[in-house]
Structure formats: C-alpha cells, structure tokens
Amino acid sequence: MTTSSYFLLVALGLLLYVCQSSFGGEHVCWLDDPNHPEGICGPQVSDIVEIRCEEKEAEQGGANNARAYTGRTSSLMKRRGFLSLLKKRGKRDEGSLQRSGRGIVCECCKHHCTKEELTEYCH
C-alpha cells in the first residue's frame, strides 16, 4: 500500500469518526413512531420546559425562585409567550423537521429527552 493510499484511508476513518460522534446523539423520528413510555407529550411539554428554563435561570444566578413571585397573570403571559415561541420555532423549523425528523416532539415525546435537550427550548 502506498503512502498516499494509507493517508487517504486514515483521513477517511477520521472523517467517519467525527461525523458519527457529532451526529450520533441526535434523535430521529417518524410520525408513526410510538411515544416513549417516559416521554413528555401534549400539554406537559410546555410545563416541563418552563420549569427547566426557570431552573436554568436560577443556576445562572437569575431569580432565586422565579415561580415564587410570578403572579397568576404573569405566569399566564409567560406561558402564552412560551407557546408562541414554540409555535414560531415550529414554523421556522417545519421544513427541517420534515426532513430530519427532529424537534421537541421527537426529542421529548417519541424519545426520552435530557435536561440539556429541554434547555435548548429556553429563550
């Protein structure tokens, strides 16, 4: 085997390794995939993401307990804003969701999502 062939083989192996490790953790779904037994689906999604975002804010030195001093009206406005954000993000990503099969439903309902994946949906 020549040196250039050996180099090409090693480069190809490294490229495959990088691609696999970069994209190996992504969830891919199809519409007919069953929901994960521990998945978060339906109205629970917005509640869980809201809680996770508040936890993230507290971890980063934000409000110590954001839920403690948000009134009912404020909480409703936050929820509406969050749902609006999800809708906008869903519309923006609609084409890529159809192509790649990824998104909050795929990550958290069809699969069991992690705290880090939930945090990606905070604004």
Swiss-Prot record:
<feature type="disulfide bond" description="Interchain (between B and A chains)">
    <location>
        <begin position="41"/>
        <end position="109"/>
    </location>
</feature>
<dbReference type="InterPro" id="IPR036438">
    <property type="entry name" value="Insulin-like_sf"/>
</dbReference>
<dbReference type="InterPro" id="IPR016179">
    <property type="entry name" value="Insulin-like"/>
</dbReference>
<keyword id="KW-0800">Toxin</keyword>
<comment type="subunit">
    <text>Heterodimer of A and B chains; disulfide-linked.</text>
</comment>
<comment type="function">
    <text>This venom insulin facilitates prey capture by rapidly inducing hypoglycemic shock. Intraperitoneal injection of this peptide into zebrafish lowers blood glucose with the same potency than human insulin. In vivo, when applied to water, this peptide reduces overall locomotor activity of zebrafish larvae, observed as a significant decrease in the percentage of time spent swimming and movement frequency.</text>
</comment>
<feature type="modified residue" description="4-carboxyglutamate; partial">
    <location>
        <position position="117"/>
    </location>
</feature>
<keyword id="KW-0313">Glucose metabolism</keyword>
<keyword id="KW-0165">Cleavage on pair of basic residues</keyword>
<dbReference type="GO" id="GO:0005576">
    <property type="term" value="C:extracellular region"/>
</dbReference>
<feature type="disulfide bond" description="Interchain (between B and A chains)">
    <location>
        <begin position="53"/>
        <end position="122"/>
    </location>
</feature>
<feature type="modified residue" description="4-carboxyglutamate">
    <location>
        <position position="107"/>
    </location>
</feature>
<dbReference type="GO" id="GO:0005179">
    <property type="term" value="F:hormone activity"/>
</dbReference>
<keyword id="KW-0732">Signal</keyword>
<dbReference type="InterPro" id="IPR022353">
    <property type="entry name" value="Insulin_CS"/>
</dbReference>
<feature type="disulfide bond">
    <location>
        <begin position="108"/>
        <end position="113"/>
    </location>
</feature>
<keyword id="KW-1015">Disulfide bond</keyword>
<comment type="similarity">
    <text>Belongs to the insulin family.</text>
</comment>
<dbReference type="GO" id="GO:0006006">
    <property type="term" value="P:glucose metabolic process"/>
</dbReference>
<keyword id="KW-0964">Secreted</keyword>
<feature type="signal peptide">
    <location>
        <begin position="1"/>
        <end position="24"/>
    </location>
</feature>
<keyword id="KW-0301">Gamma-carboxyglutamic acid</keyword>
<protein>
    <recommendedName>
        <fullName>Insulin-like peptide-1</fullName>
    </recommendedName>
</protein>
<feature type="propeptide" description="C peptide">
    <location>
        <begin position="59"/>
        <end position="102"/>
    </location>
</feature>
<keyword id="KW-0372">Hormone</keyword>
<keyword id="KW-0379">Hydroxylation</keyword>
<feature type="disulfide bond">
    <location>
        <begin position="29"/>
        <end position="106"/>
    </location>
</feature>
<feature type="modified residue" description="4-hydroxyproline; partial">
    <location>
        <position position="34"/>
    </location>
</feature>
<keyword id="KW-0119">Carbohydrate metabolism</keyword>
<dbReference type="Pfam" id="PF00049">
    <property type="entry name" value="Insulin"/>
</dbReference>
<dbReference type="InterPro" id="IPR016724">
    <property type="entry name" value="Insulin-rel_pep"/>
</dbReference>
<dbReference type="GO" id="GO:0090729">
    <property type="term" value="F:toxin activity"/>
</dbReference>
